[in-house]
Amino acid sequence: MHCPFCNATDTKVIDSRLVGEGHQVRRRRECTECHERFTTFEGAELVMPRVIKRDGTRQPFDEEKLRSGMLKAVEKRPVSIDQIDQAMNKIKSTLRATGEREVPSEMVGNLMMDSLIELDKVAYIRFASVYRAFEDVSEFGEAIARLQK
């Protein structure tokens, strides 16, 4: 670790503590040359897989796109922001747990539908109608029938 004061390359760790619910390590360091002290934070870099779209193109996972879709689905429904955050964290954890560098967009959509069905059935129908491109009332009826099973 380079000293931010004198740019020396040799520093020593004086103290280490877990912070952020154990997801980060706070380290107090001292430069062996100028003896200045400074604090660093370490955390694991969790990389999300890339998304393979239906047309075959690949793009980085976009958390804002996921949040936007979920917010549209739950609009004017009794679902809290905390519930949305929990659902999004569950989706991201599931995607990371695949261990794959790339995942199909269908997987992301299906995970979102699974989350919405637990949060709010009306929100699920809203999202499914757009995601599955329902074209007539019978498709809505089939989706509702699946919910009632």
Swiss-Prot record:
Does this entry carry the keyword Metal-binding? Answer: yes
Cofactor dependence is on: Zn(2+)
Signal sequence coordinates: none
Q: Which domain of life is it from?
A: Bacteria
Q: Which InterPro entries match?
A: ATP-cone_dom, NrdR-like_N, RNR_NrdR-like
Start and end of every ATP-cone domain?
49-139
Name the chain's protein: Transcriptional repressor NrdR
* Encoding gene (name): nrdR
